[in-house]
A protein has these predicted regions:
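Phosphate-binding P-loop
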Residues: 1-4
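Short hydrophobic/aromatic beta-strand immediately N-terminal to the Walker A/P-loop
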Residues: 7-8
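P-loop (Walker A) phosphate-binding loop of NTP-binding proteins
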Residues: 12
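Conserved catalytic-core segment of NTP-binding enzymes
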Residues: 15, 19-24, 30-31, 36, ...
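Charged, low-complexity, helix-prone segments enriched in Lys/Glu/Asp/Gln
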Residues: 28, 76-80, 84, 96, ...
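P-loop/Walker-type NTP enzyme "switch/lid" segment
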Residues: 42-121, 136-150, 173
Length: 192
């Protein structure tokens, strides 16, 4: 089996995606691969113990010997805008505007294109890196892939078209990407 550079583990809730993602990262690390476990951060505003589950994941990964990255939409957006405009200050200002925050929430799939861009950018910058995304559900993973294609089709010119073109080209590279759909052995799971 040849190793890929980018793996997504997805499926219904409660089927063991996180356990399998962590186990796969542990396997890669034991085989001397530079592995990064990626998850969507819990961005909900909580009481004192914010993001307890995220901290537990990070601690578990650290105990197993690999790095983690919690994807935060506003941080990824700010980084993307700063790279395009060559200005951290302007990017900080833009993402704090109510207009930008509404725009991200209003346009279906935009957040997933931003996340996909962040992951692929890291993989291009570091050719030794293997990324393992623990996707919360199959809908999220599918939206991430479809949105990249949809935005590429909608914008026939400009920065977004160029960036999504690069993303699609990278995803279609042979032996680059693998989608792992985790399901319970039931008829319902097979039909879905």
């Amino acid at each position: 089996m040849s190793l890929k550079r980018f793996y997504i583990f997805t499926g219904k809730g409660g089927v063991g995606k996180t356990a399998l993602s962590l186990a796969f990262c542990s396997h890669l690390t034991e085989n001397k691969q530079n592995c990064l476990y990626i998850y969507f951060q819990n961005n909900k505003i909580q009481a004192k113990n914010t993001n307890t589950a995220d901290k537990q994941l990070e601690q578990m990964a650290m105990d197993l010997g690999f790095k983690t990255l919690g994807l935060d939409l506003m941080a990824c957006s700010q980084e993307y805008i700063a790279n395009k405009l060559k200005s951290e200050n302007i990017a900080k200002w833009i993402i704090k505007t109510p207009f930008f925050q509404s725009l991200v929430n209003m346009i279906p799939g935009l957040s997933y294109v931003i996340y996909m861009g962040k992951i692929l950018e890291m993989l291009v910058k570091d050719p030794t890196l293997t990324a393992v995304l623990d996707s919360p559900s199959s809908g999220h993973a599918l939206t991430m892939l479809e949105s990249t294609q949809n935005f590429n089709s909608i914008f026939k010119d400009g920065i977004i078209h160029e960036d999504t073109n690069l993303m699609l080209k990278e995803l279609q590279t042979q032996d680059f990407f693998k989608l792992n759909i985790i399901a319970l052995p039931t008829l319902l799971a097979l039909h879905e």
